[in-house]
Every structure is written in C-alpha cells, then in structure tokens.
Amino acid sequence: MSTVNELVNLVDETYDISQIEKEIGLDNIALSDLELLATGGYSPLTGFLGKKDYDSVVETLRLANGSVWSIPITLPVTEEVAETLKVGEEVKLVNGGNVYGVIQIEDIFVPDKEKEALLVYKTTDEAHPGVKKLYERPNVYVGGAIVLTKRFENNPFPSYHLDPIETREEFKKRGWKTVVGFQTRNPVHRAHEYIQKSALEIVDGLFLNPLVGETKSDDIPADVRMESYEVLLQNYYPKNRVFLSVFPAAMRYAGPREAIFHALVRKNFGCTHFIVGRDHAGVGDYYGTYEAQEIFANFTVEELGITPLFFEHSFYCTKCEAMASTKTCPHGKEDHVILSGTKVRELLRNGEVPPSTFSRKEVVEVLIKGLKKEVVTE
C-alpha cells in the first residue's frame, strides 16, 4: 500500500519579519510542534489548530474535513497576551530570544480543558503527566497557519535529526519499498528487539525513531538512550536493514490516541507499517493493555495511509529458551522473565545488572554509565 501523501513544507528562512511587531512566546512543546508542522511531520496540518478543527479532533479524532488526526496541536497563550492579539494579524513566534517563525492568526479561543483532558487523555487526574502539562500551559489557544523562519541550531543529535523529506530519501536510496516504524522513549531491551526483528522479517527496513522531545522526569535521558541504540544496532542488527533518526516531539502520554498520532507521523516520515505494542504511549494504569491497538479498529488502513502491526507482550521463556510472546509460547508466567522499564531503571540505579535474557550487555553498560553520570550531576 502506498504512503505517498503530500508533505507540507512551511520552512522559509528568507521570510521578511522586519515589519512584524507582536510576538508570542513558545514553550518547548510548542517549539517542537512548530518545527514538525513546518517540516511536514504533522502533514496535513499547516498550522496550530483553530477552534473548528480543535473541537473536531477532541471529539471525533478527525479534522473538520474528515481526515484522521487524533492529538490537538495547539498554541496556548495567556489571557494578557490574547488581549493584545487580533484575528488576521501576523505575529512572531519566539523562544529564548530567537524568532523561529510566524503565525497568521485565524482564531483565538478559550478551550474547555477539562473536556480536552477527559477525551484526549481519558482522565482529569493531574497526576497524569499529559494532563498536568495541559493544565500548566496557558488558557487561551491561538490558531493559524505558520511559517518556520529559522531552523534550530542546537539540536542535541544533529546527525540523527532528519526531516520527513530526508528520511523518505534515505529509504528510497536503500531501495526499501516497505518500512516499519518503531516509536520508543525507552532503551531497547530484548523484548523490543524481538518485536522489531519479527516485524523486520516481513518488510524491507526498520525505522527506529526514538522520541527526544520533552518526556517525564524519570524517563532515561535522551543522550543515554541514543548511545544505547547505537551500541545495539552496531552489534545486533544488520546495518543495511535499519535506519536510526530522532523524533523531536514532546511525549503526550495519551495512550491510544497517541498511538494513532505516532502512526500518522511515521507515515509522513516514509513508513508503510507501524509497530503498536502493549500499552503504547501509556503511563501508569490509565489505559488498558491493548487499548492502543483496539483504537485502530475505528479507522480503515486507507484512511490512515499506514498499516499498523500489533504485537503481544513479549518476554524470555526459560522453558522455550527463547524470546516469545503469549501467541507463541504455551508456558506459564512462572517460566517468563518479564521486567518492566521501571524495574530496570530501579536495578540500574542500584548498580545491579539485569539478566542477559532481558537486556544486551552492551546496552546495560551504557545505561549504568549514563545513570552514574546522572547521579554525579544531580
């Protein structure tokens, strides 16, 4: 199935901003959203959502024109700033003293944040990191088309920071007709490796696309994770079958809705397939184990433009003496080595080494070294 959808390109570094006086300050989430809007990562979006599209996305997981889109991409401003703005104006988008873009204001509105929390995150509990962030951000949304007038200079992983047009080119260069995307915000342990390689058996290439935008404080730092991906790919994956590049978005922790969002974005990066595992983009116990897979039943593959691949929870089985899942292994829980990401972080922080059935030794070494460094700097 083809994924040739038109990529939005709203990057124009020659755009004249000299006559624009007003400005809106962007937080880190809005800044990463601005870049992904401009480079086509969020195609078909061409800007921050206006009220009509926002309401439609929150209520129906579709834009007002019917296209599937599951996460509201919004630009929040304070009441004070909103009072100075008018529909029809061009306003500069600023972060850390730099102008990164311009928005043509089409809409200024006050969202019902409780409704957004309930429908997007399925909870209004402020202990949920996505809801907490939603409530912390300002209370008025500004919608409108954007232009990115300045590229970010201090990307932490410049050699892995590729726009959708570039990843598509890379896949083409490698002759990959089918590419499976894998989203992660964690180090890749044996369970993920098993799933990725199972998927790789049926496609030409694997696109490992770790998220390096804002995550919650107890997630393993991005630089440590990147090093762990490098050693894993170097030692255990065929180099001509895998491509590593970062996804600079913030983590929303919106579970099922974010699974759809992650699939749509990977389609833009050039993937034909997308891996959805257990509790994709989940946090705590807010979502059912396979809810992020079940939500895909609401959409056709044609509408999505990408084929989801669903995987059960995998583990090492001491009886099978292999990685397996409940689909392939008949043995009981007592034979399964299952460690959660949280459990692994705990072991590593205590300097304990997870078993080789759980994680590759090279990955463990990188993580222990990284976490020691973290302790020293805290």
Curated annotation (Swiss-Prot):
The keyword ATP-binding is assigned to this record: yes
Cross-referenced InterPro entries: ATP-Sase_PUA-like_dom (IPR025980), PUA-like_sf (IPR015947), Rossmann-like_a/b/a_fold (IPR014729), SO4_adenylyltransferase_pro (IPR020792), Sulfurylase_cat_dom (IPR024951), Sulphate_adenylyltransferase (IPR002650)
EC number(s) recorded for this UniProt protein: 2.7.7.4
Keywords, in A-Z order: ATP-binding, Nucleotide-binding, Nucleotidyltransferase, Transferase
PANTHER family for this protein: PTHR43509, SULFATE ADENYLYLTRANSFERASE (PTHR43509:SF1)
Biological process according to GO: hydrogen sulfide biosynthetic process; sulfate assimilation
Disulfide bonds, paired cysteine numbers: none
Protein name as it appears in the record: Sulfate adenylyltransferase
Family (UniProt): Belongs to the sulfate adenylyltransferase family.
Highest taxon of source: Bacteria
GO molecular function, one term: sulfate adenylyltransferase (ATP) activity
Reaction catalysed by this enzyme: sulfate + ATP + H(+) = adenosine 5'-phosphosulfate + diphosphate
Cross-referenced Pfam families: ATP-sulfurylase, PUA_2
Pathway connected to this protein: Sulfur metabolism; hydrogen sulfide biosynthesis; sulfite from sulfate: step 1/3
Signal peptide start and end residues: none
